Design a protein with these regions (language model features):
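Subset of outer-membrane beta-barrel
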Residues: 1-225
Length: 225
């Protein structure tokens, strides 16, 4: 999976290899996943307006750095509902950006739950969901509604989300033959009004790995969207 986030002067890229083991439990399916990550953090100081004197805390050009990381997660689905928990940035790495700057990446804890609502069309469903995120002293709750179109191996998704007192989000994406591509834009609404937000591009690929009985093992993303 490849993820690219840009917020102001800062960029965050993540390259991930993920594996999930699936098995039946209590009439549903439990997935246990692990992920190996390569994080790339960047600061584009050329975009900053620091005045004539300059600011030594901000680089004068674009600098970047990378570190290895890991994530783990659990996912359970039963009938129309699902829930999951995950911990990203298990190693809580410090990324050296350039020669004198550092970016500390704290652990991120996620909880998500949702429900699949059927419509009159066999190809469409509506999925309301909630995600709770905690990272150090920061807590946020995301409320999202997705419309999902599925036909044979094609799946298209359109979503809108709201984070109370913080942001609104729009997302579009699709999956075909195991390749998933999605784009999301989040605009800040805190303060006097809406301001520029951040973009997210995510590309992932899913394939089945048969290590024993058919259908027991699969490789897939455990990242929550």
């Amino acid at each position: 999976m490849f993820q690219n986030d840009e917020i102001g002067l800062f960029s965050h890229k993540r390259f991930s290899l993920q594996y999930a083991y699936h098995f039946k439990l209590w009439g549903g399916q439990l997935s246990v996943g692990a992920e190996a990550d390569m994080l790339a953090e960047g600061i584009d100081g050329g975009k900053a307006d620091v005045g004539e004197s300059g600011d030594p805390a901000i680089p004068t050009s674009e600098v970047d750095g990378a570190r290895f990381d890991a994530s783990v997660g659990l996912w359970y689905a039963h009938g129309p509902w699902y829930a999951g928990v995950a911990m990203q940035h298990v190693t809580m790495p410090t990324v050296n950006v350039g020669e004198q700057w550092q970016v500390e990446v704290p652990a991120l804890y996620n909880f998500t739950a949702g429900y699949n609502i059927k419509t009159k069309s066999p190809f469409l469903k509506i999925v309301p969901s909630v995600m709770l995120r905690y990272q150090g002293v920061d807590f946020r709750a995301d409320l999202t509604a997705r419309v999902v179109y599925t036909h044979q191996k094609l799946q298209l998704t359109c979503a809108a989300g709201y984070t109370p007192n913080r942001a609104v989000m729009l997302q579009v994406g699709g999956t075909l033959h195991g390749v998933k591509l999605s784009y999301a834009y989040e605009a800040n609404v805190a303060g006097m009004g809406m301001s520029s937000g951040n973009h997210e591009l995510c590309v992932s690929y899913r394939m089945e790995i048969d290590l024993g009985k058919k259908g027991k093992n699969k490789h897939q993303s455990v990242r929550f969207l």
